[in-house]
A protein has these predicted regions:
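Short, structured active-site-proximal loop/turn typified by the sulfatase FGly-forming signature C/S-X-P-X-R
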Residues: 60-101, 148
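Low-complexity, glycine/alanine/valine/leucine- and proline-rich hydrophobic stretches
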Residues: 361-411, 415-423
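Secreted, luminal/periplasmic, and some membrane-associated catalytic domains
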Residues: 44, 51, 90, 114-127, ...
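His/Asp/Glu-rich, glycine-adjacent segments
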Residues: 4, 21, 99-227, 233, ...
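A cross-taxon signal for low-complexity, glycine/charged-rich
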Residues: 1, 18-19
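Beta-strand elements within well-structured catalytic alpha/beta cores of enzymes
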Residues: 43-59, 74, 98, 140, ...
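Active-site-proximal N-terminal segment of extracellular/periplasmic enzymes that hydrolyze or transfer
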Residues: 24-79
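Low-complexity, intrinsically disordered or signal/transmembrane-proximal segments
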Residues: 7-8, 15, 27
Length: 430
């Protein structure tokens, strides 16, 4: 298949310091090595799917209701567990963690959005130059494995495609060649089909025998709008399950994880349950005492209005940091306040890119900056459902084939992370 160069990443030489430790990479006859882990080259087609926003409750309700016959069968025929996502529980840091097998402290991407302290500008974290290490995908492609990264959201394309010489494109901006491959026009960015298009593209690559290792990253449009058990959620998840079944029919090992869960963050009357933290702290401590950055911010504003349960707070030089943190912690709905170094240590985030302090909402509370900065009209009558905090850290961790005894023991005795999925899929199945 020939792809429009606009949707294929460059083929620059791999960068990094070879070695056995974090951020080193090696290539061996049947292995690659990255960030302290060795990965076997796939013995059969291997497909890792990040089901964006797939809170475990969708499976807990959907499997008994017959929504997930294929994925439900992995309880008997494969491995069916839970893992912890990286913090904060947003799309970019977790997708990059999954494809590097490492937390944000190693790869450098700790949000969708950050404040550049040197320039004072707020910046979208979509540039692969912000990444601090290579990806499993790039190293596998460099070792001769036919590798593809397909994402629903174009914001992830450059990050996932860092130094990747294989196929890399998004359904959001699919080229005419990709539309021809899949057999239909690219979907609307606010649709369930944005995700299904990704899965269908992956299926086509396997049917054509043009892929050995695929990473397929979906969109959480449906999960933001529809709770577990809602008809629209069930219809969407049945469609995902059908496509997972087809991948298995084609002989693939399938691994499924999520980048985060999802929780209702609305009041009983349906109004969003939001703390506008910048407004609150500046009212108490004076104008411009703080600047609040919402790292959930991305182009998909209709999903969440840039409201999640994790924010970064930058204090003015004249502000009393301890007093600001104490005031934030006293607000109902705030679950945790940590200074920047402690947040980086506890949540494995890069300390040099951290704020003065971070504030996390509880499972049912979103935190914003100022009311004027958040447009909630896109919710269009839906309850606010979002993510970012500790309440959305538990995610599915599923494999279509059973684990070896060694990896079964690991799964039972250590804390599983969503970014363990490539290790388990490539090294740990029977």
């Amino acid at each position: 298949m020939v792809l429009n160069p606009r949707y294929q990443l460059d083929r620059r030489p791999l960068q990094g310091v070879p070695g056995d430790g974090w951020c080193g990479e090696k290539q061996m006859p049947d292995l690659i090595e990255l960030n302290g882990r060795r990965y076997r080259k796939p013995q059969r087609p291997t497909v890792i799917i990040c089901v964006d926003g797939c809170d475990p409750e969708y499976l807990d309700r959907g499997i008994p209701d017959g929504v997930f016959p294929t994925i439900g069968s992995f309880r008997r025929n494969g491995y069916f567990g839970r893992a912890d996502a990286a913090m904060p529980t947003f799309t970019n840091p977790n997708n990059v963690s999954i494809v590097t097998g490492a937390p944000p402290s190693i790869h450098g991407i700790a949000g969708n959005y950050y404040l550049d302290r040197e320039t004072g500008r707020e910046v979208m974290m979509t540039d692969e130059r912000l990444m601090l290490c290579e990806t499993i995908l790039a190293l596998m492609a460099g070792a001769g494995i036919r590798t593809a990264a397909i994402t629903a959201k174009d914001k992830l394309r450059k990050l996932l495609g860092r130094n990747l010489s294989g196929i890399c494109f998004s359904s959001e901006r699919a080229s005419s060649e990709v539309e021809e491959l899949v057999g239909r026009a690219k979907p609307d960015m606010y649709s369930a089909d944005l995700s299904l298009f990704v899965l269908d593209a992956g299926i086509k690559l396997l049917e054509r025998r043009e892929g050995d290792l695929l990473y397929l990253s979906l969109s959480d449009y449906i999960q933001h709008a529809h709770a577990p058990g809602d008809p629209a959620a069930d219809t969407f998840h049945r469609a995902i399950d059908d496509r997972v079944g087809r991948l298995v029919e084609l002989g693939a090992v399938v691994g499924l994880v999520a980048d985060h869960g999802m929780n209702d963050k609305a009041l009983p009357d349906g109004a969003p349950n939001v703390i506008f933290l910048e407004d609150t702290l500046n009212k108490r401590f004076g104008a411009d005492a703080v600047r609040v950055i919402c790292p959930i911010t991305d182009p998909f504003v209709r999903h969440h209005g840039a409201l999640g349960s994790f924010v970064r707070v930058y204090a003015s030089k004249a502000a009393d940091l301890a007093a600001l943190m104490a005031a934030g912690a006293s607000i109902p709905g705030v679950a945790l306040v940590l200074d920047g170094p402690e947040a980086a240590r506890r949540f494995e985030m890069p300390v040099d890119r951290e704020a003065d302090f971070v504030v996390l909402g509880d499972a049912n509370t979103a935190i914003g900056a100022s009311r004027a900065e958040h447009d909630l009209s896109g919710l269009a009558g839906h309850r606010l459902r979002s993510h970012g905090g500790l309440g959305e850290q538990r995610v599915p961790f599923i494999l279509s084939r059973p684990l070896t005894p060694e990896y079964r023991h690991l799964a039972e005795t250590r804390r599983l992370r969503n970014f363990d999925i490539f290790d388990f899929a490539l090294n740990g199945i029977r």
